[in-house]
Amino acid sequence: MPRSPGQFGQWVLIVGTAWVLASALAWAGPGTADRGFFRLRLSQPWPQEAALTDIAGEPVRFPSSSPFSLVDAAATSGRSPPTLAMATLFLPRGASAAAPVPAVVMLHGASGVQHQREMTYARQLSAMGVAALVIDSFGARRDMATGFVDRLLNITETMILADAYAALRYLKSRPDIDGSRVVLIGFSYGGMAATYAAFEQAAEVFAPDGERFAGHVAFYAPCIAEFEDRRATGAPLIMLYGGKDAIIDPARCEALARDLEAGGSRVGIIVYPEAFHQWDGRVAGPRKIGRNLAPCRFRVARDGTVTGSLWPFPMADAFNRRMILGLCSDSEGYLIGRDDQVRQRSNADLAAFLEEVFEGPGVPDAQAARRTPPPR
């Protein structure tokens, strides 16, 4: 059974109906009056795609890197080549240094940036007063891989993590963005990275100066990694997935949530019982997709080394990654399928989470959030 974290801040999660009631709307901390329009605009019905045609994003570039693994990401490794990240920024009307706005960073899935998904979410949020930065991790690394399988073998979750934290630094440098209120949102493959970014081990590597996201959202992200170091950044996370999504192992997601909670972050799980994978994508479905990663189990050691359960060597390069993924995945595949009714419900759940984060005190104090979890 999915769990309902009854003490997740001030919001109550009802699993099954998947609606979130945010009593955090009554939060009365400093500056709430100045941010009240976020509550009002996010609580209203989301604008339809047809009404968003006049919202154009701005292509932006900023420094990032391309480490294959967390071990490579270390500053002294020499195996983290510089990369110029690619992204599209959607700014709300009226955003300025005098009126900075909160923001989200979006990480795409294995199929790359989709107009129907990332770009539509970004335009909708921008219309409601939230800046959205859509990262194109594949586009920035076309020299490394182009085909679907080739990209998944050579453009790793660690590289997407590098882009995520580079995006956070970029947004914090802009006077029209409230850098203390930036939420990381990931879809499927990007959702894995959005979850891993909540672990302090990853944050310390990519943001040693203390930059942290105010919240994390993982849409239908496979829960296949276990971090030996369970320290969390302290920022909250919600996982959203479908009850008919075969790429999700609910027990593993529960375990991952418990690890993050033990490390200092609050975690909520929202399940839409009738939904397949990618209910907000472009495919009407249900349509079967290739191989399924749900049986895979990765372990991330304290030094950043990643190992699988069926291969004796670490995931240090594309060959070993291919072997580990090939041995652990199955050929039964999984179903994807757009469901507009589920999309409406997940919109409401996402809005409630963003309201809580944006109307709260901002990024948690980094030192207070870092605590050593009890031994396993």
Describe each model-derived feature in a short phrase.
Residues 12-24:
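Bacterial N-terminal signal peptides
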Residues 261-267, 273-376:
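Alpha/beta-hydrolase-fold serine-hydrolase catalytic core, especially in secreted/extracellular enzymes
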Residues 239-241:
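Short beta-strand/loop motif that positions the catalytic acidic residue
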Residues 66, 243-245, 273-276:
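Acidic beta-to-alpha connecting loop that harbors the catalytic carboxylate
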Residues 156-234, 246, 251:
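Primarily recognizes the serine-hydrolase "nucleophile elbow" in alpha/beta-hydrolase
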Residues 78, 85, 100-173, 329-332:
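Serine-hydrolase catalytic machinery in alpha/beta-hydrolase-like enzymes
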Residues 38-99:
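N-terminal cap/lid segment of alpha/beta-hydrolase-fold proteins
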Residues 249-259:
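Short alpha-helix in the alpha/beta-hydrolase fold that links the catalytic acid
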